Each structure stands twice: as structure tokens, then as C-alpha cells.
Amino acid sequence: MSWFALSFGAALTQATQFALVKGRARGIPPLVIVTWTQAIAAASWAAFFLVSGHAFALPRFAWPAVAVCAVLVMGMSGLLARASARGDISIVGPVFALSPIFTVLPDAALSGTWPSPLGWVGLSLSVLGTSTLSGSGTGWRGLAALFGRRDALDALGAALLLGLVAAVDRWGARTIGPASYLLGSHGATALLAGLIAVLTTPAGLAESVRVRNVVTLVGHGLLGAAGTGMQTTALTMAPAAYVNAIRRMSSVVAVLLGRALFAEPDLGRRLSAALLACAGAACRLLAGR
């Protein structure tokens, strides 16, 4: 399977997670959502090793990368969960699509890859699209108005962290293999988030075992495991900025789901912004050829 197909599959699971959190998990603390999601993903990869007979290997030199990834993923996933639950997913999706911008420097440092000139055009298109989301003009004025919204600001923070996560994931997956790296990183993130959840929101953690919440969290976790697996495998085939560029297509799906399921406003403007992000993704794809 090509890196494009894997990245697009990850985009679809991401948009579905946005909708699932807004529709069924608004009352669940973000840190609890992160704990469950990462634990289910770790269990899924552990099952893969048990069934397939593949050898798990996480050498000591990779431990720092796993630890860094755990901190970054906990922050990123927590911000995304909060933004999706409290805001408009048709805003969250397009803003989160800015993540390739924050991938460029760390990816260059860890993997030695830079965008081509056409790739830079793609990044510029995504910024232009994002600046129109607020309805207060374009450029800096539009961006300032947009990031006055809490959901947009949370999504921007998540996009920044995803840019860093993607670069670390690319290094880890290429160095020790996607499966071993993912089991290690998901497990570490689940332990870290779970410990902090026990200390800061024990009531929320206890409430999460109700049947309705369990169904929601397991579904969210399985989507996350599938999406992360597809993305990390794609990262072994292409630069992180290219993979994240295709994942930006989740912004279009998020806008459409937001309108269809939650009657979110400004469909035309938000869809235009998401389509500009996709145009940027197309530039990145062409630049990779």
C-alpha cells in the first residue's frame, strides 16, 4: 500500500475521532480520553506481536525518543480532545491542518529532508486558507480573529505538537520499525497520561468505566490505533511533511461532518479553507514526485 493511501486513511480516522468526541465524549476529561486511547492502541499492538510472532525490540538508544513522544502525544491529544468537545470541529479540522508547517524544521534536523519549492507553495496555501476561517478578513487580521477562539487556539497547539511528533515518529519508525516503536510509544503515553489522570481527575477516570463511556472510548481508541498505525507506516516511506500534508484532507471531512451532525455554521467559508489546505496537500504530493 502506498504512503498516500495510508496517509489518507489516517485522515479519515482523524476526522471521525473529532466527531465522536463532540457527539459522545463532551463530559469526559481530555486526559481520560488520552489514557484510554493510548492504552487501547498499546493493547492492539501487543496483540499484533502475540498473533504474528514478530519479535518486539526497543533498544535503549530509542528510549529517549519514546519518552519525548509520550509527552508530546499526551499534550497534542489532550488539546485536540478539548477543542473537539467544546468547539466546532469544522474549525478544529482546518486549523489542525497547519501541522505540516511545524514539521519542516524538526524533520530536517532528524531526517535531513526539506520541502521543495512547490512544497513551500503548498504550505503557503494552507496558511491562506486558515486566515479566512474567522470571517474577519484575510492575512494577519483574519488569523488574529481566528485565534481569539479557544477551540482554534487549542487546535493550533495540537498542530504544533503534531509537527514535532511526526518528525520523532519518522525517526523511530525508520530506526527500529513501526510496530515496536508504536507499542513502546503508545504504552509510555498511556502510563504517563494514566498516572496524571489518577492524580488530577480520579472522579473522571472512575466515571469513564460506565458502559456508554466505555463504548465511546474503545471506539475512539481503535480509530486512533488504526490511524496512528497507518500514519507511522507511511512515515517510513515518505518525509513527515508529505505524510502530514495528505492527512490535512481530514479537514474537509471534519467540516462536512460538523455541518451534517452538529449544524455548525459558515459551511462555505470553512469548506473553502479546508479545500485550500487540500490544494496545499496536492502541491506537497506533486513536489514529492
In which residue ranges do the predicted regions lie?
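Specific alpha-helical transmembrane segments that line the substrate/conduction pathway
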Residues: 68-73, 82-130, 182-191, 240-260
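Juxtamembrane helix-loop boundary signature in multi-pass membrane transporters
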Residues: 1-8, 101-160, 170, 265-289
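Generic multipass alpha-helical transmembrane bundles of integral membrane proteins
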Residues: 164, 177-180
